[in-house]
Amino acid sequence: MGKLLRKPLNERIAPGVTLVQDINQANSPLSYVGFRLIEMEKGAIYQEELTELECCIVALTGKITVSEGNDIFPEIGTRANVFEKIPTDSVFISGGRAFQVKADTEKARVALCYSPANQDLPTTLIKASDNSIEQRGKYQNKRLVHNILPDVSEVASSLLVVEVYTNGGNFSSYPPHKHDRDNLPAESLLEESYYHEINPEQGFIFQRVYTDERTLDETMAVEHQNAVIVPEGYHPVGVPDGYDSYYLNVMAGPNRVWKFHNDPDHEWILERD
């Protein structure tokens, strides 16, 4: 299956551009999902030509200018730190196009989320105000969700992107759920990646990835700027007291529908008053 936990690479790939995470088909068990995290210094430029993939560029922190053809989106981005817990701006770019990202602030952190380009779609600015915001769960199962590219959006052809905040002492992606069977309308097949940040940064969270048969069963202590790959199975997250969790999810599969199946052993928690 390969290693599911990915530590930061911190490789300089261009002047002022550091590659922190790089998940793709060649270095992972994933067939649909790709993910890159780059950190940029002011004035630095990152360029990429997409072929068969579409991409959502998320301005995690700082301000950036994104250019594709005649489309230029100047100084997008809304926060200096993800733990401001406000939505941010993103840009969707379809396959077969080239784009450029330029850092406009002293530092910028940018997520690049990839999946197969099944249609030729317009380059689109997804404003922070376009994000739908949800408060999910109760008891010690509360989380704040920013939907960047939900399955109801028609901006992308296969890509799903969401941000999730979980306070200390809470669980998220819980009760454990999975989406690894192409069995609609009961369940959809979606691979997933998690990019994690933790506040304060010296903290850690726990994430378990497991299947019903336990042919895959891996529990990880996940630190700041680690990534976790979820090719299949349930994938709950637990956050220790005193620390807050942020993660960015990228999902994709044969159908752009998020339909999950809860672990029946733990679904009872949803039935509480």
UniProtKB/Swiss-Prot annotation:
Q: What top-tier enzyme class does this entry carry?
A: isomerase
Enzyme Commission number: 5.3.1.30
* Isomerase is among the record's keywords: yes
Task: State any GO BP term from the record.
Answer: inositol catabolic process
> In the UniProt record, does the keyword GTP-binding occur?
no
Pathway per its UniProt entry is: Polyol metabolism; myo-inositol degradation into acetyl-CoA; acetyl-CoA from myo-inositol: step 4/7
Describe the family membership recorded for this protein in Swiss-Prot or TrEMBL: Belongs to the isomerase IolB family.
Function per UniProt: Involved in the isomerization of 5-deoxy-glucuronate (5DG) to 5-dehydro-2-deoxy-D-gluconate (DKG or 2-deoxy-5-keto-D-gluconate).
Under which name does UniProt file this protein? 5-deoxy-glucuronate isomerase
Q: Which organism is it from?
A: Listeria monocytogenes serotype 4a (strain HCC23)
